[in-house]
């Protein structure tokens, strides 16, 4: 699948790698989690935000996921939330800008850059102001202001990454934690 190609599927391949020198990569069996690198992740987000704004000038764009928290280990992939009125049209504009569609659900299409094998960013296109938009931001913001919960999330991710190299299973196993955090965040 080349850059700009349409690839829809449930799984997302992750690399199997040995530890990177300097202690940055934490050993896992299937997914590499690296130590926090908030400056580099913020710079990568800014580069992609610029690229996204060229394709979608009116889109709302937010840095989400573990790399946005900045204090916990994460896969070296920046997650970006893009809010638009027409998710399909927005995704197609991003394909024209070089992003590759990886999957879709109702009101949510996700794309990667530069390709699924060398992913440095995943862009989640959702309805601006919709449920998915609010949940992603609520989760990020709660973990940013709750260091103990962020550390618990980090520990869960490390355990799961060591147990599986299947992206779908890794994500599904985090679902209960995410649901609990969303409930707590909504109550606070």
Swiss-Prot record:
Disulfide pairings: none
User: Spans of biased composition, class Gly residues?
Assistant: 1-12
Domain of life of the native organism: Bacteria
Alphabetical list of Pfam families matching this protein? GrpB
Region labeled Disordered — which residues? 1-37
**InterPro entries attached here?**
GrpB/CoaE, NT_sf
As for family, the record states: Belongs to the UPF0157 (GrpB) family.
**PANTHER family, from UniProt?**
GRPB DOMAIN PROTEIN (AFU_ORTHOLOGUE AFUA_1G01530) (PTHR34822), GRPB FAMILY PROTEIN (PTHR34822:SF1)
Write the protein's name. UPF0157 protein DR_2534
Q: From what organism does this protein derive?
A: Deinococcus radiodurans (strain ATCC 13939 / DSM 20539 / JCM 16871 / CCUG 27074 / LMG 4051 / NBRC 15346 / NCIMB 9279 / VKM B-1422 / R1)
Q: What is the lineage of its organism?
A: Bacteria, Thermotogati, Deinococcota, Deinococci, Deinococcales
């Amino acid at each position: 699948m080349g850059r700009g190609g349409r690839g829809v599927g449930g799984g997302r391949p992750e690399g199997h790698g040995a530890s990177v020198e300097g202690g940055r990569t934490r050993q896992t069996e299937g997914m590499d989690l690296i130590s926090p690198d908030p400056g580099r992740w913020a710079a990568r987000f800014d580069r992609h935000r610029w690229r996204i704004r060229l394709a979608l000038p009116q889109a709302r764009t937010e840095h989400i996921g573990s790399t946005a928290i900045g204090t916990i280990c994460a896969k070296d992939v920046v997650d970006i939330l893009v809010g638009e009125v027409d998710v399909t049209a927005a995704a197609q504009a991003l394909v024209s800008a070089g992003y590759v569609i990886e999957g879709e659900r109702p009101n949510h299409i996700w794309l990667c850059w530069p390709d699924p094998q060398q992913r440095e960013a995943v862009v989640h296109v959702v309805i601006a102001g919709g449920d998915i938009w609010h949940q992603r931001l609520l989760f990020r913001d709660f973990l940013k202001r709750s260091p103990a919960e962020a550390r618990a999330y980090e520990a869960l991710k490390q355990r799961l990454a060591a147990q599986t190299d299947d992206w779908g299973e890794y994500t599904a196993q985090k679902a209960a934690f995410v649901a609990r955090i969303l409930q707590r965040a909504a109550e606070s």
